[in-house]
């Protein structure tokens, strides 16, 4: 009896093994099996990836515009140099494409969806197209031409001319514009942030007429207003800000996040990287006299 029972159990286990091998997912959810609940989690993951990308570029304009001075922990790059030998420059290029891989997964998921009328699916597509346009905006404004990747690939893709990259950005923003909802929360991509990037793209291309049109779409909304004092302007950069200048912001928590701006930009730590230059302090506000800061 024992031998018979063991034989039956062995037969049952080997018979089921093939069925178990064919079950999905083994270690992840297949792209074609993502539910709307899964898409929400996927969106959150892409937001986290984009936070790292934005962190890479957040201070770049100030560094290259010489608003900062270099500290003992870092040597300032020549603002006219974009040499690949620079660790910072190479890191920015690489981060664009690691983030692009995740964003393209989002875009591919939207494009393959059979339920494009769903608000969650629309948000997925609109966010993906916007983030891809933002990535390529960072690329084209620094390097000009860049490889255009509409889908994830490990193939070597040649660099496209700068004009083609700008056209790709405008194409993606057009798609995002048709999918994104109106502004409700600064921590989520909305139609307003798409309009804001469209305005920057038009400015870069010297299309001033359309730049003004896109900018007006944002400025004329009651959700937003320009700061009128230095204190109001500074309020945009603090935690839990209620500034009406904020159109889109990625949530960065010092308590849980690893991306800490104060570790790079301060003049207190022994190995600080950057701090604002004296000229930056003295010319930042028209009403500088009302501030407690000094340029020392």
Regions found by a protein language model. Name each.
Residues 16-61:
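Acidic, glycine-rich segments characteristic of secretory precursors and extracytoplasmic regions
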Residues 17, 145, 170-183, 191-232:
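Aromatic-residue-lined binding/catalytic grooves and analogous aromatic/hydrophobic interfacial grooves
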Residues 87, 223-295:
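Elongated scaffold/linker segments in the mid-to-C-terminal portions of large proteins
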Residues 40, 73-142, 156-160, 178-181:
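Conserved, well-structured interaction surfaces
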Residues 1-25:
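Bacterial Sec-dependent N-terminal signal peptides
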